[in-house]
Regions:
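Small cysteine-rich, disulfide-bonded extracellular modules of the LU/uPAR three-finger superfamily
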Residues: 1-95, 101-136
């Protein structure tokens, strides 16, 4: 499934560009409800995974992003990963990820795994994601 930037995020992203909105810190999170992202989504459409040493991961270190101009241009973060502990079976199926703004908790983008869901059941099971955005 393609990455979805919801309609609600397009407004504040444009605001960043023209200086009418202030950027916020971002966190990437896993969702475990069987849901396909849409352009009309808000953050409450997603059920964040819980348990087994899981926590959202900050995307706020500028040095972890690489921007490449081109057609399309690319913003790519270093790979983030979650390694689950002995209680991994608490997680179960993970269908994708979503990114939120930290202060307002707005949804920024989401993506359902094309080869998922990933069934987390065993200690040391991992999910790895390389967040990337393109603009053309």
């Amino acid at each position: 499934m393609a990455l979805i930037v919801p309609d609600s995020a397009e407004g504040f992203i444009l605001g960043y560009i023209v200086g009418t909105d202030t950027p916020e810190a971002l966190t990437i999170r896993l969702f475990d409800n069987n849901y396909t992202p849409t352009e009309t989504d808000v953050v409450s459409a997603y059920t964040e995974a819980t348990g087994s040493n899981y926590a959202g991961i900050s995307l706020n270190t500028p040095a972890n992003w690489t921007i490449t101009d081109g057609a399309p241009s690319l913003a790519e973060h270093i790979q983030v990963s979650w390694t689950f502990d002995a209680n991994a079976s608490q997680i179960g199926n993970v269908y994708g990820y979503y990114v939120t703004r930290d202060t307002s908790n707005d949804l920024v983008w989401a993506e359902r795994f094309t080869n998922g869901p990933y069934n987390i059941q065993t200690q040391n099971d991992q999910i790895r994601i390389t967040p990337r955005l393109t603009a053309n």
